[in-house]
């Protein structure tokens, strides 16, 4: 059982069942019935919400426990969600296969982050959107969630550089926000929000 299987084996939903606030704000950019990929969707709160908005959603994660809970949540909400067990260290979507990629608090180590981010961006069709929210390095000053390894925290500038040539930035912001996302994300946080459109 891996780290995330253990975490998601706890009762309830670690990050709640409601979608991320930034995703909710920006999802209007998506065309009706978009094909959406949600890597690192865990227990499914974001993928299930997107499916409820009428999109065709595939949630991928390396936790079978999380994906089982995602399917349970989808059934409770009366929506269809495709789930696939993958490891982002060596997995890539088919090129130009989806209309949007949603990365919400998916913190990858530097050893494969660049490869994974560029592979996910390449999975977007021309004009497709990447919607990303993650903890910024200044999150280390807060106790509201996230990894304690600065190598796994993202700045807007870093993302813009990593995705150059694939995505045109539409928003690259960092600052403080109050999180209320289940017991796992609570309180004042310093986050990075990044939006990009496939070139």
Where are the predicted features?
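Conserved class I S-adenosyl-L-methionine
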Residues: 1-31, 138
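Conserved SAM/SAH-binding beta-strand->alpha-helix loop
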Residues: 63-65
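A short acidic, Gly/Pro-enriched loop at the edge of an enzyme's catalytic core
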Residues: 89-100
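A short glycine-rich, Lys/Arg-flanked "PGG" loop and its adjoining helix->strand segment in the class I
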Residues: 114-126
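Conserved beta-strand signature within the Rossmann-like core of class I S-adenosyl-L-methionine
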Residues: 127-135
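Short alpha-helix
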Residues: 151-173
């Amino acid at each position: 059982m891996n780290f995330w299987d253990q975490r998601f084996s706890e009762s309830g939903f670690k990050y709640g069942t409601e979608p991320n606030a930034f995703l909710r704000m920006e999802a209007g950019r998506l065309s009706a019935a978009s094909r959406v990929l949600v890597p690192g969707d865990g227990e499914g709160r974001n993928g299930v919400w997107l499916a409820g908005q009428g999109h065709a959603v595939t949630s991928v994660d390396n936790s079978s426990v999380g994906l089982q809970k995602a399917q349970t949540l989808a059934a409770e909400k009366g929506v269809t969600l495709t789930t696939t067990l993958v490891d982002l260290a060596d997995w890539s979507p088919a090129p130009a296969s989806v209309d949007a990629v949603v990365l919400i608090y998916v913190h990858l180590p530097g050893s494969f982050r660049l490869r994974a981010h560029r592979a996910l961006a390449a999975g977007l069709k021309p004009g497709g959107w990447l919607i990303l929210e993650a903890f910024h390095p200044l999150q280390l000053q807060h106790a509201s969630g996230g990894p304690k390894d600065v190598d796994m925290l993202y700045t807007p500038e870093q993302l813009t550089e990593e995705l150059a040539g694939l995505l045109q930035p539409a928003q690259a912001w960092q600052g403080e926000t109050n999180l209320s996302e289940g017991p796992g994300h609570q309180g004042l946080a310093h986050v990075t929000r990044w939006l990009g459109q496939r070139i």
